[in-house]
């Protein structure tokens, strides 16, 4: 806060003390109304409106605020209309020709037409940031409002929504897009493809979204850096395979985060310059073609459920860092990816094994007898085991790497609980193929 503004806020709380007394000078009176409006815009809208009771001169100053923030999460009562009445009054009385942001978070149900009315009004004022979080509302169609999104820099819709798009969607100013539980329909009678043209978009997030009647979704965003997709799917795909293809045209893309459990619904395609990916995969059999989309990465994080299955792992010829979260009783899973990463230098693993699972002596023996992949023998320099527990299973994996990694430099064992000195001494005494390998306990 600016020093002058901070001093102006130091008004005594006693009702008996006058605003302009010998000890306290009214600094606000000397501020321009535009400055006061900026200050009020930083407050929650309810607090900004409450300043209207200070004096006659303050009665309408709040109507010039440019940031609207409404939140009823502390009062769950669908029968109480005071919140919607308040929003209706503020949106109707606001006098600012330009509104920077509109934030609405509600845990109650109300008439969806009210939300549509509020958005229609604020979008006409060159709105830049729009955030709507209303999980209890029925499905809302934003389709007719979509052309009004052209001024938006940030759009976050966390509500059951419908977006009907019949032509290439162009949002020229959008930098951040986050959709949750959206139904996206391709309404074009000419093309089976859906083109999203966001020339300055930097971050794309989609979770629990569904795409209908679309063969290919093309996201044309040359400045896109972060792409996240969480449990999205497709329906009524107009091709025999019933697979919706998603092509991301983004030469500056830095990281992909993907979580899914329907391997045959979506196929992803990215530029070959993609450096980093995080994939959480579960259920059923994932086609080799899905993983092939990520073979260009140098850094890969994989979360694999116990029921994850893939017939063959493609070659990750540029992979240097692998973080694998998996059920360590399935040692073949680790071997699948080690054999497919010829230049791997850093391996980080974390166990997803159920506490009730106990590895058999046979499975531990199988791990020791597996031929070491080339990357372990000649390339691996760092091993990290996260959430390390000195049980038979994790010790067997640790010893496998120590026995075979000839140029290993560091072993990092990150444990949530203290490891006894006796256990540390036992681990430090394990034979090592690399004379330079050191073990660090975290």
From Swiss-Prot:
Domain of life, per lineage: Eukaryota
First and last residues of every LRR repeat: 126-147, 151-172, 173-194
InterPro entries in alphabetical order: F-box-like_dom_sf, F-box_dom, FBD, FBL13/AtMIF1-like, LRR_dom_sf
Membrane-crossing residue ranges in chain numbering: none
UniProt keyword list: Leucine-rich repeat, Repeat
Domain annotation FBD: ranges: 370-414
Domain (F-box) ranges: 26-73
Record-linked Gene3D superfamilies: Ribonuclease Inhibitor (3.80.10.10)
Protein name, per record: F-box/FBD/LRR-repeat protein At3g14710
Origin species: Arabidopsis thaliana (Mouse-ear cress)
Taxonomy of the source species: Eukaryota, Viridiplantae, Streptophyta, Embryophyta, Tracheophyta
């Amino acid at each position: 806060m600016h020093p002058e503004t901070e001093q102006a806020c130091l008004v005594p709380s006693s009702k008996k003390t006058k605003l302009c007394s010998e000890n306290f000078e009214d600094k606000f009176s000397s501020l321009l109304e535009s400055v006061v409006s900026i200050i009020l815009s930083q407050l929650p809208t309810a607090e900004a409106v409450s300043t209207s009771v200070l004096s006659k001169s303050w009665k309408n100053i709040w109507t010039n605020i440019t940031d609207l923030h409404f939140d009823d999460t502390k009062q769950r009562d669908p029968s109480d209309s005071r919140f919607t009445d308040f929003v209706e009054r503020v949106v109707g009385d606001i006098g600012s020709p330009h509104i920077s942001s509109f934030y609405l978070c509600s845990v109650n149900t109300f008439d969806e037409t009210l939300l549509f009315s509020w958005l229609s009004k604020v979008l006409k004022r060159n709105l830049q940031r729009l955030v709507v979080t209303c999980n209890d509302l029925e499905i809302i169609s934003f389709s007719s409002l979509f052309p009004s999104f052209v001024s938006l820099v940030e759009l976050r819709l966390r509500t059951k929504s419908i977006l009907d798009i019949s032509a290439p969607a162009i949002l020229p100013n959008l930098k951040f897009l986050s959709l949750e539980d959206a139904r996206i329909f391709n309404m074009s009678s000419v093309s089976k493809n859906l083109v999203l043209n966001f020339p300055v978009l930097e971050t794309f997030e989609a979770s629990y979204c569904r795409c209908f009647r679309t063969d290919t979704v093309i996201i044309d965003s040359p400045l896109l850096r972060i792409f996240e997709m969480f449990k999205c799917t497709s329906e009524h795909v107009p091709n025999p395979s019933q697979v919706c293809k998603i092509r991301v045209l983004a030469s500056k893309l830095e990281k992909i985060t993907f979580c899914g459990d329907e391997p045959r619904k979506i196929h992803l395609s990215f530029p070959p310059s993609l450096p980093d990916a995080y994939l959480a995969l579960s259920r059923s059999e994932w086609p080799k073609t899905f993983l092939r989309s990520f073979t260009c990465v140098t850094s890969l994080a994989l979360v694999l459920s116990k029921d994850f299955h893939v017939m063959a792992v493609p070659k990750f010829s540029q992979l240097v860092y692998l973080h694998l979260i998996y059920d360590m009783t399935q040692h073949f899973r680790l071997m699948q990816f080690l054999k497919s990463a010829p230049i791997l230098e850093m391996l980080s693993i974390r166990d997803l094994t159920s506490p009730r699972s106990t590895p058999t002596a046979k499975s531990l023996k199988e791990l020791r007898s597996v031929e070491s992949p080339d990357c372990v023998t000649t390339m691996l320099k760092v091993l990290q085991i996260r959430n390390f527990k000195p049980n038979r299973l994790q010790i067997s994996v640790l010893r496998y790497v120590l026995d075979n990694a000839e140029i290993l430099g560091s072993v990092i064992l990150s444990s949530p609980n203290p490891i006894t000195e006796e256990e540390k001494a036992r681990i430090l005494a394990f034979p090592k193929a690399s004379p330079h390998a050191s073990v660090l306990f975290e």
